[in-house]
Each structure stands twice: as structure tokens, then as C-alpha cells.
Amino acid sequence: MGLAVGAPLPQGLYFVNTGDWGNRSGVDTSVGVTIPVLAWSTPWTILGGRVQFLLAGPLVEVGVHHTTYLRGVYNPLVAGQLAWDLGNNWGFSYLLGAYLNMDSEVAWSSTSLNQRFALSYTGDRWNLTVNAIWGTHFDHVTDRPQLSGCPAPFALNGCNPDFLNVDLTATRKFGDWEAGLVAFGSTDLNIPITGYQKQSQVAVGGLIGHNFGPAILQAYLTTDVYEKNYGGHDTRLWGRVILPLWTAPTAPPVATPLYRK
């Protein structure tokens, strides 16, 4: 959310860090996440699409009031992406990557294929983006419960459902400021084992951001308007910093002679 991920990035190397912290009502569970991402927009194209690469190493902490506190490394992401400039301020991107298996209490116990389809409109200072994220786990049931344990009597196993997430962004820039609405939804796509209850949620919120020149800062707040089998509604505060580490120099304009023979 908050990024025009359908549009190709200008050639360069970028650091993006998204952090969020929230609490789920009813079960009094708090979750904190930080997602540092290194993105490289290359000078190459394939079929007219800009070739881009992304690496992410998320960290997660989970706390249940007066019960447990867990923290560790989430599944790292390795991905490649093609992003097309469709003209008239429209862009489309396709990402293919994988979240790698990680032996951690706060990670899925399986490698998953990750595909993302994004469409963005960026005309007249708008960012209108829809981003669909489709995850397919290679191992739906494992011998490590980790982030997602199976229901009894299989509590010592891990259940890793396939999933679909959809992120929506509708923001507009006003000078160096940006403001607008964001939303996301997620749902499990399959039942890994008998007795597993598929989870889903929908959340909406607002975003504000500011371009400080070398860095862009964003903040947004979301809250669930629908949830199923999560045990409560989630409210989360998000923050993001976008920092260009290097950008390709632009070619100087070709001078037009004032006099021709």
C-alpha cells in the first residue's frame, strides 16, 4: 500500500523500509514488523518491461499479553520484476519471487512462490494502484508449527495455506505532501489439513506522506472492517522511508542550433 508498484522505477538503487505495529482486539495480541527492501531498477528491458530486482529481510515480533513474546526473522524474499510504461500515465508490473523457508518461530515453515500483479495510474499527481499478491506454498503441512500451527490433534505440525492479498491505494500529491486512502484484504485459498479454519480480513485506512528531497516519508493507519477466524479486529500504524541510494544520470538535452546554413 502507498506505492505505485505498477509503474517502472527510474533506473537506480533504492532502499525502502516499511514498519508497522498493531494490536488485535479480543485476543490482546500485538505484532510488530519491519521490512527492509533493496530494489534495483536496471537499465535492461525484456519485452518492453523494465527489469527490476528486490531483496527483503523482514523481522517480526509477536506478543500475547501476559502469555508469550516471540521475535525473529521472517521468511526472506528474493524476486525479479518486469514493469511496463503503458503510456498515458498507466503502468503494469509482474513480480515473480519466493519467500524462502526459515527455521524461526515467526516464519512460515515452507518456501512459497510469490507472484504479484500491479496496475498503477500516476497522472495529475494521483497514485491509483491495485496490487494482487498470490502466494503458493511448496509444503502445506510440515513437522514444524512455527508461525502457523495446525489445529489439534496435529498441533506439532505446521499448516501453510496458499493465500491471496489485494492492496489498494488512492492518494494525491499536493506539492511535497501526499494524502489519501489505502485498503487491503487477505484470504487463505486452501485447507492444508482437516480441521484448519481458513482466515480472511479486510482493512481500510488513511495515508499521509511528505517528500523531503533525498527521502520520502509515509505514515498510515489501518483498521479491520471484517475478519474471519483471526479472533479479533486488527488496528495497525504503519511508517515507511524511501531513500534513493543511487540514480542513473540523465542525459543532457541536445542543443538546437540557433542558425542553420
Residue ranges and their predicted role:
Residues V27-V33, Y69-N75, V106-S112, N157-F163, ...:
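Transmembrane beta-barrel outer-membrane domains
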Residues M1-P43, R50, A56-T68, N101, ...:
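Transmembrane beta-barrel domains of bacterial outer-membrane proteins
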Residues D20, D143, L147-K261:
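Outer membrane beta-barrel transmembrane domains
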Residues D20-G26, P58-H66, A83-G87, G97-V106, ...:
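Sequence/structural signature of outer-membrane beta-barrel proteins
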Residues L13-F15, G49-L55, F92-L96, L128-A132, ...:
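Transmembrane beta-strands of outer-membrane beta-barrel proteins
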Residues L3-V5, N17, P36-T42, V78-W84, ...:
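Residues on the lipid-exposed face of transmembrane beta-strands in outer-membrane beta-barrel proteins
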Residues Y94-A98, S110-L113:
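Loop-centered beta-sheet repeat module
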Residues A4-G12, G26-D28, T42-Q52, H66, ...:
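Short loop/turn motifs that connect adjacent beta-strands in outer-membrane beta-barrel proteins
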